[in-house]
């Protein structure tokens, strides 16, 4: 009877067996252990730090709270979220903003103005600091204008001025109120006197609304300062403000350095301005749609609400 041949291990098998003998059982489970403790991919900005308390807040919780922290801080938000939170069910039509001639002064403050515009557009996804939407707010049709502080500090320039005028004209064409959410550090220095001209032009646009008998409601958000405060932000029929919003012309530090006195606690904040009669009501973000709908419905009651 022929004896069975013992298989001769291949070269690769010999190497594997030798490695297992050297490492023992640990070598067999090591790959699984390494996989279990390997660095995992985690989404960026998973946590957001509260500017008041330093608490780390889970981003999804903050989104569910409309970007209002447990401490009550109303975080700054852009046009997309503002439209989503303001219009009924978030449904709205985005209206175009006019194009303008860019950088007429060929301005550079260490970085060309055109490069700053390009960087702001890439960061925000917006063409400029103004965005316009049309839809229903608390059941009332309205044109809503949102100023984006993330776009070069929401500064008022030619494009923003044209955007405001376009929003006013859209409201007149549709015979509906205009609601403006303001957020700005002032006029855009890179456009010089051309930016200051927008203060007068936006004021004329508001006069057009008044001549048409249409309401103009302003919601002041953090921060609203400079030339914006000195023009369309303070010309509304009704002024609402989000809690804790900084509202004024010059900032508190500039004022303190000028008058060399300490300002009262909460100076220039929305709650302080309500006490002084500069703002009609401080309204939390979650209540804004219902409050705006009630105000718009009341102001339009004499002529009946119309939808375009």
From Swiss-Prot:
Location(s), subcellular: Cytoplasm
Function of the molecule: Component of the acetyl coenzyme A carboxylase (ACC) complex. Biotin carboxylase (BC) catalyzes the carboxylation of biotin on its carrier protein (BCCP) and then the CO(2) group is transferred by the transcarboxylase to acetyl-CoA to form malonyl-CoA.
Keyword list, A-Z: ATP-binding, Cytoplasm, Fatty acid biosynthesis, Fatty acid metabolism, Lipid biosynthesis, Lipid metabolism, Nucleotide-binding, Transferase
Descriptive protein name: Acetyl-coenzyme A carboxylase carboxyl transferase subunit beta
PROSITE patterns: COA_CT_NTER
Subunit structure: Acetyl-CoA carboxylase is a heterohexamer composed of biotin carboxyl carrier protein (AccB), biotin carboxylase (AccC) and two subunits each of ACCase subunit alpha (AccA) and ACCase subunit beta (AccD).
Record has Acetylation as a keyword: no
Homology family: Belongs to the AccD/PCCB family.
Taxonomic source organism: Caulobacter sp. (strain K31)
Pathway where this protein functions: Lipid metabolism; malonyl-CoA biosynthesis; malonyl-CoA from acetyl-CoA: step 1/1
Catalytic activity: N(6)-carboxybiotinyl-L-lysyl-[protein] + acetyl-CoA = N(6)-biotinyl-L-lysyl-[protein] + malonyl-CoA
Family matches, as Gene3D superfamilies: 2-enoyl-CoA Hydratase, Chain A, domain 1
The UniProt record lists the keyword NAD: no
A Pfam family recorded for this sequence: Carboxyl_trans
Residue stretches making up the CoA carboxyltransferase N-terminal domain: 46-308
Protein EC: 2.1.3.15
Single GO MF annotation: ATP binding
Enzyme class: transferase
Upper taxonomic lineage: Bacteria, Pseudomonadati, Pseudomonadota, Alphaproteobacteria, Caulobacterales
One example of a Gene Ontology biological process annotation: fatty acid biosynthetic process
One of the record's GO cellular component terms: acetate CoA-transferase complex
Primary location recorded for the protein, binned into one broad class: cytoplasm
């Amino acid at each position: 009877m022929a004896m069975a041949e013992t298989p001769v291990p291949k070269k690769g098998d010999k190497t594997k067996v030798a490695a297992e003998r050297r490492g023992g059982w640990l070598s067999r489970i090591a790959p699984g252990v390494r996989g279990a403790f390997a660095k995992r991919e985690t989404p960026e900005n998973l946590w957001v730090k509260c500017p008041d308390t330093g608490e780390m807040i889970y981003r999804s919780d903050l989104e569910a709270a409309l970007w209002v922290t447990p401490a009550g801080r109303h975080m700054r938000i852009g046009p997309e979220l503002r439209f989503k939170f303001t219009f009924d069910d978030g449904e709205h039509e985005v209206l175009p903003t006019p194009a303008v001639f860019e950088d007429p002064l060929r301005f550079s403050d260490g970085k060309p103005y055109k490069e700053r515009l390009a960087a702001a557009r890439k960061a925000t996804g917006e063409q400029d600091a103004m965005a316009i939407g049309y839809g229903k707010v608390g059941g009332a049709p309205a044109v809503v204008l949102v100023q984006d502080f993330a776009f070069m500090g929401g500064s008022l320039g030619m494009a923003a001025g044209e955007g405001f005028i376009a929003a006013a004209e859209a409201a007149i064409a549709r015979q509906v109120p205009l609601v403006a959410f303001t957020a700005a550090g002032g006029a855009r220095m890179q456009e010089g006197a051309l930016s200051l001209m927008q203060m007068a032009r936006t004021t004329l646009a508001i006069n057009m609304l008044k001549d048409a008998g249409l309401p103009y409601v302003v919601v002041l958000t953090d921060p609203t300062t400079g030339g914006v405060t000195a023009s369309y932000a303070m010309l509304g029929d009704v002024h609402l403000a989000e809690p804790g919003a900084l509202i004024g012309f010059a900032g508190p530090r500039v004022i303190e350095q000028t008058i060399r006195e300490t300002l009262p606690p909460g100076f220039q904040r929305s709650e302080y301005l309500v006490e002084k009669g500069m703002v009609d009501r401080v309204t939390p973000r979650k209540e804004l749609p219902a409050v705006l709908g009630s105000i718009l419905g009341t102001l339009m009651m004499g002529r009946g609400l119309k939808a375009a």
